[in-house]
Amino acid sequence: MRTKTIYFFSLFLTITMMTGCFHISSGPKPSKSKMTKKYSVTPFNKIENKAPANIVFTQGNVTKVEADGPDNYIPQLIVMVKDSTLSISMDKDKFKNFKSSKINISITSPVLCNIKQRGVGSIYLKDSVKVTDLSI
């Protein structure tokens, strides 16, 4: 009886672990086709990233945002400006356990005073960025 209990417990544990592994790796795989998308945004001075993306910020006279990556990921990006904050995110239901950062986003703005990084990826400040006060 004890052997059967150990056997069933081991089987249950194995199935649970396998199911957990499948759940972690869920989400769409990146396509091999790449695309670039330019976003029309209003001026901002803060960046909040909740997407699995690598961001490169360049200080410049114009405000622009451009993303490149797999053509099945880029259309899922949600890019908007609200209260002077550039917000970058993705549909949580489709990319709940998405851990890859195959998306690259180039951001240019004259002023930057706040950065919030909540997604997988990195934020790089390209060249020199002149700020009075920067909160990260």
Residues covered by each model-derived region:
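Positively charged n-region of N-terminal signal peptides that target proteins for export
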Residues: 1-7
